[in-house]
Amino acid sequence: MEKFAPEFHGEDANNKATKFLESIKGKFASSKDPKKKDSIISVNSIDIEVTKESPITSGTNIINPTSEADSTPETKANYPRKPLVSFKEDLTPSDNPFSKLYKETIETFDNNEEESSYSYEEINDQTNDNITARLDRIDEKLSEILGMLHTLVVASAGPTSARDGIRDAMVGLREEMIEKIRAEALMTNDRLEAMARLRNEESEKMAKDTSDEVPLNPTSKKLSDLLEDNDSDNDLSLDDF
């Protein structure tokens, strides 16, 4: 027959429980120092008790924002306009006969104060494509002349025989280029004058023609009469067209 633990009921069970709690009271006494205060950290609604000996620490890292450079328009440097053609070599030696010519040419072709004589409409008009192309060719030829002058400046520092030969050849080419540029400029001016005359003529015609009537050719007149009379005898034949 199996043995079971004794059962206690009523006052007897209460006395037994009291004696058991008094017997184990000294075994689980707290060893914490009463002077040290504990802190309670609540994490996700769960209370965690942390003593002062806990290695849990907290710190804050302060990041200093870097000061950006002042980029106001007043502090920005104004860079000068670069010339159309520039060279790295020193082109102004005192004993060079072509340095003055080269300098004057650069100043003539790279004057910031000069503006184009063509208006915005003339430059962007589709009918002026040929004129724009001519101006582009003139610009290219002017750049070639600057290159020739630069070659003259560099060649002037070489031997006498080579210098004289290059000088004669380059001077001749320069004269030819100048003549071609003059011819292109004259043709461009003539074309602009012709366009101006046509524009003035059209403006005069539009100013004189103030009526709303449109002239009709013979076929249009027959069609108009047919619609006005509404007569079947005035039908048009293929010969009328």
Swiss-Prot record:
Region (Binding to RNA-directed RNA polymerase L): 216-232
GO BP term, example: symbiont-mediated suppression of host NF-kappaB cascade
Site (described: Interaction with protein M2-1): 108
InterPro entries associated with the record: EF_Hand_1_Ca_BS, Pprotein_pneumovir
Residues with Phosphoserine modification: 116-117, 119, 232, 237
Region (Binding to host phosphatase PP1): 81-87
Main location: virion
Binding to protein M2-1: annotated segments: 90-110
Protein function: Plays critical roles in regulating RNA replication and transcription through its interactions with multiple proteins. Tethers the RNA-directed RNA polymerase L to the nucleoprotein-RNA complex. Recruits the M2-1 protein, a processivity factor that is required for efficient transcription of viral RNA. Acts as a chaperone for neo-synthesized nucleoprotein by forming an N-P complex that preserves N in a monomeric and RNA-free state and prevents the association of nascent N with host cell RNAs. Recruits the host phosphatase PP1 to inclusion bodies to regulate viral transcription.
Protein family (similarity comment): Belongs to the pneumoviridae phosphoprotein P family.
Protein name according to UniProt: Phosphoprotein
Organism phylogeny: Viruses, Riboviria, Orthornavirae, Negarnaviricota, Haploviricotina
Gene name as annotated: P
